[in-house]
A protein has these predicted regions:
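Structural motif
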Residues: 97-119, 227-242
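Bacterial lipoprotein signal-peptidase II cleavage site
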Residues: 18-30
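Hydrophobic alpha-helical segments within soluble ligand-binding/sensing domains
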Residues: 61-62, 153-194, 294-314
Length: 350
């Protein structure tokens, strides 16, 4: 009996020891397994994140953007802005297709083209000149729109403010240094007493510049008289009326006048009336001189904005309207016109 009890006691003690060892083994295994599991989960998460980032980068690199362009009319300044935009996109190295549309100065065509570009589902639309910008901005609040060759987007009702656009429209302004242009006028033509301001009354950008010009002309001690047109058919008759009343004509960056500048120059130069212009393209078409911006560079500036917006690095709402500085403006003179008028521009040559 005693032997039996002793054997049972030994057996129980052995089982207790084995149970204790088993518990310790499980604890060690648990302690060893838990960190390993956490590390595996972390590694898996890092791998998934890396794959996601690589996929996103690949998608961005391979994406082909769809861009629509609406240009109001063909003339040197707007053509240069358009080319600068395209060259800027090419320099950025992005893949894109572009649908180029020109309204040929027709507001009805502007509206039709604007609707087409919106309905085509473009990733971004470039609008060149104020009427074109207003047309497309009225068709969508979703597609990013960049404008260029627009003098004052805020006054034109395109943005909440030029500093903080606040919507789907931003871009660049072609506000020229009107003050410096009037100063150039008085320097080249010190005997002038009356300045004729020639522009299209339907263009907000021209009205804005004309108001600045009036103040600067008055500050220079000169008189001014307005000569406005509402269609290209009126240009010749209006200029013919102006040349008998003024000593010089000032034409701001007005799209209708720019497109009809050869007619303006023909009438003015025949009557020995100099034309100081808002931009270099108008000078090339027969105007006397200007101190203005480079529209090609303005287009490239707009392209830089476009690339950031397309890549998701910026939004139109938070992209301020861009401007070229006065230091980036240059003198442009037409030697042939100067010779016709008997004016020496050699002092302004580079």
């Amino acid at each position: 009996m005693k032997k039996l009890l002793a054997m049972m006691l030994v057996t129980c003690m052995s089982l207790s020891v084995l149970a204790g060892c088993g518990a310790k083994t499980e604890e060690v295994a648990a302690e060893t397994t838990e960190p390993a599991t956490e590390e595996a989960v972390a590694d898996e998460a890092e791998t998934e994140e890396a794959v996601t980032e690589e996929t996103a980068a690949a998608d961005t690199a391979e994406k082909e953007y769809k861009i629509g362009v609406i240009q109001l009319v063909e003339h040197a300044a707007l053509d240069a802005a358009n080319q600068g935009f395209i060259d800027g996109l090419n320099e950025a190295g992005i893949k894109y297709t572009v649908d180029q549309q020109n309204a040929q100065g027709d507001q009805t065509a502007c509206d039709t083209i604007a609707s087409k570009l919106v309905n085509d589902g473009n990733d971004l639309i470039l609008a060149i000149a104020t009427p074109a910008a207003q047309a497309v901005a009225g068709k969508t609040t979703d597609i990013p729109i960049l404008v260029t060759a627009v003098t004052d987007p805020e006054t034109s009702g395109l943005v909440t403010s030029n500093e903080a656009p606040g919507g789907n429209v931003s871009g660049t302004s072609d506000l020229t240094p009107v003050k410096e242009q009037i100063a150039l006028l008085t320097e080249i033509l010190p005997e002038a007493k009356t300045v004729g301001i020639l522009y299209c009354s339907a263009e907000d950008n021209s009205i804005f510049q004309a108001d600045i010009a009036k103040a600067e002309i008055e500050a220079a001690g000169l008189a001014w008289e307005e000569f406005t047109v509402s269609s290209s058919n009126e240009i010749q008759s209006v200029v013919e009326s102006a040349v008998s009343k003024v000593d010089v004509i000032y034409a701001p960056t007005d799209n209708m006048i720019a497109a009809g500048m050869t007619t303006v120059a023909m009438v003015a130069n025949e009557n020995k009336i100099p034309v100081i212009c808002g931009e270099a393209g108008m000078v090339e078409a027969g105007g006397l001189a200007t101190y203005g911006i480079d529209y090609y560079n303005l287009g490239k500036m707009t392209a830089q904005q476009a690339v950031k917006i397309l890549k998701g690095e910026a939004t139109t709402a938070e992209t301020p309207i861009g401007y070229l500085t006065a230091e980036q403006c240059e003198f442009a003179g037409n030697d042939e016109t100067a010779a016709t008028l008997g004016i020496d521009l050699s002092a302004y040559a580079k």
